[in-house]
């Protein structure tokens, strides 16, 4: 599972969760990373006994930091609905969930360009939708010419490679946050299968070469502002085609 909240000790080892002044500026020792990866902590190691959780793996530590923002947004939307508010947008650090409309028109959402900054594209959001982005520019440090970012691949223990940015559209914000993290790790080769397995139908991925990969749903909704961007569209599957199904 590419979204794995059980790798809290790996997250701690990299130290991105602390304040910037305390954040490490060099990668952890390779031996320490490999030792944690070798034990493969996962959610399957947890047994639930009433209100108690038991972990069968000594290297298991839960860290829900990747989805905390999404969960907070979902709680805020639920509270607004309880108050009778049916048109709203809740935004935390650029990740958001919108319900209803902006007084009639959809909510315009700007997507950041990870290469050089600025605005990459505009999305129109309405109804009940969340837009979440995961990128290598959000938390990182550079050591000996190589940039290390905060999205840790549980399979290797190192920052995910091959992807600069992922943006997903999903209904609930918690699911969108988990999907953005998982697709960032999946990379250009596995993002379609991962999105389908997680029930996400609208995705955009920018690979390490700056190329934009989009599924048909996202391509039909997005307004790209960078006219020179190289786009790699994904064709719609033919009826009955299950070639992108997980395990195929």
Indicate where each model-derived feature is located.
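Mature catalytic core of soluble alpha/beta enzymes
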Residues: 1-248
């Amino acid at each position: 599972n590419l979204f794995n909240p059980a790798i809290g000790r790996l997250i701690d080892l990299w130290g991105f969760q602390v304040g910037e002044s305390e954040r490490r500026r060099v990668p952890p020792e390779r031996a320490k990373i490999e030792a944690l990866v070798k034990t493969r902590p996962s959610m399957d190691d947890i047994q639930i006994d009433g209100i108690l959780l038991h972990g069968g793996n000594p290297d298991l530590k839960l860290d829900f930091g990747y989805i905390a923002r999404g969960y907070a947004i979902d709680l805020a939307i639920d509270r607004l609905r309880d108050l009778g508010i049916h048109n709203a947008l809740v935004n935390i650090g650029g990740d958001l969930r919108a319900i209803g409309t902006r007084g009639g028109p959809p909510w315009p959402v700007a997507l950041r360009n990870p290469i050089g900054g600025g605005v990459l594209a505009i999305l129109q959001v309405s109804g009940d939708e969340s837009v979440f982005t995961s990128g290598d520019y959000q938390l990182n440090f550079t050591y000996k010419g190589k940039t290390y970012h905060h999205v840790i691949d549980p399979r290797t223990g190192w920052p995910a490679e091959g992807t600069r940015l992922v943006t997903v559209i999903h209904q609930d914000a918690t699911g969108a946050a988990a999907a953005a993290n998982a697709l960032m790790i999946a990379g250009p080769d596995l993002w379609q299968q991962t999105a389908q397995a997680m029930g996400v139908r609208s995705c955009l991925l920018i690979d390490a070469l700056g190329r934009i990969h989009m599924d048909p749903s996202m391509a039909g909704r997005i307004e790209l502002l960078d006219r020179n961007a190289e786009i790699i569209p994904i064709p719609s599957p033919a009826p009955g085609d299950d070639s992108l199904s997980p395990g195929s």
